[in-house]
Regions:
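Helix-to-loop junction immediately C-terminal to a conserved catalytic motif
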Residues: 52
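Conserved ABC transporter NBD signature motif
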Residues: 59-73, 112
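Catalytic Walker B motif of ABC-type/P-loop ATPase nucleotide-binding domains
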Residues: 146-150
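ABC transporter nucleotide-binding domain
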Residues: 165-178, 182-249
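C-terminal coupling/interaction segments
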Residues: 250-286
């Protein structure tokens, strides 16, 4: 068996003249959590669907658990898609029973948080409870690889933390995990990161590897709202973090010139760039 639970070799997917994924190579090994990052439309979901055999490649090859991504190998995988993959007109326990029968597995015990809603239709549950249900379904047959597409999107911070405890427990138990996320604090919990932009893999490794030589400055001024509007109107990339203004990949002199012309005084100082700022720079370059 291969040392990787997931593998893509120079994978490309085209839809007509549009290239959604362009010559991407990547791996996921047992026991590690790999974060797949990128803006909307970067190609993350298309790549995942090819890795799982749900979408054919135009070029290149994929492997799931050392073999083709067929039904036999998918039976050893757990998958939580963006839409959760649950039957909204069935109850929580009915969803679990259906999945257990499909995988010839025992019906799993419900976590305490779902015990009181076991007979509730999934469509009537809060989003956090739906995501917890999707996790229980995906883990019921003890998968060797777990693929999670935006698994915590739209849920509260406590629910996100609980779901990430589950993700880490799966990796600690030997499963390989591939997860997409828009939350940078979640990216920091991954063992390794992959960054996609415009269908291509543009960075991999640690957080520092992803950020690379991207630079950023912080702009401090009491009139933060006006400052943001001025910089935005000058086509300068701006990120607003509360009332703090950050500007990636821009000469401080350019920022000072735009603000001085509008009569705004501000303190401009270099700061360490973030993954989010690297993604913004890449999006503007394309």
């Amino acid at each position: 068996m291969s040392d990787e639970v997931l593998r893509a070799d120079s994978v490309t997917r085209r839809f007509g003249d549009f290239t959604a994924v362009d010559s991407v190579s990547m791996t996921v090994r047992p026991g590690e959590v790999v974060g797949l990052l990128g803006a909307n439309g970067a190609g993350k979901t298309t790549l995942i669907r090819m890795l799982l055999g749900l979408l054919a490649t135009t070029e290149g090859a994929v492997e799931l658990l050392g073999g083709p991504p067929d039904r036999t190998h998918r039976a050893r995988m757990g998958y939580v898609p963006q839409n959760l993959g649950l039957y909204r007109d069935l109850t929580v326990v009915e969803n679990l029973s259906f999945s257990a029968a499909a995988y010839d597995a025992a019906i799993p015990d419900l976590p305490a948080a779902l015990a009181d809603v076991r007979n509730t239709l999934v469509g009537d549950l809060a989003l956090g409870a739906q995501r917890q249900t999707a996790f229980v379904v995906a883990l019921a047959h003890h998968p060797e690889v777990l693929v999670l597409d935006e698994p915590t999107s739209g849920v509260d911070a406590l629910s996100r933390a609980e779901l990430w405890d589950t993700i880490r427990a799966q990796a600690d138990g030997g499963a390989g995990v591939l997860v997409t996320t828009h939350y940078m604090e979640e990216a920091q919990q991954c063992d390794r990161l992959l960054l996609m932009a415009g269908g291509r893999l543009v960075g991999s490794g640690s957080e520092d590897d992803i950020i690379g030589d991207t630079r950023a400055v912080a702009v401090h001024t009491p009139d933060w709202a006006r400052t943001f509007a001025i910089l935005n109107a000058a086509d300068i990339p701006v990120i607003l973090d509360g009332r703090a203004i950050r500007v990636p990949d821009t000469d401080p002199a350019t920022i000072d010139e735009a603000l001085s012309a509008a009569g705004v005084e501000a303190e401009i100082r270099p700061v360490r760039a973030t993954i989010e700022e690297r993604m913004l720079v890449l999006a503007r370059e394309r």
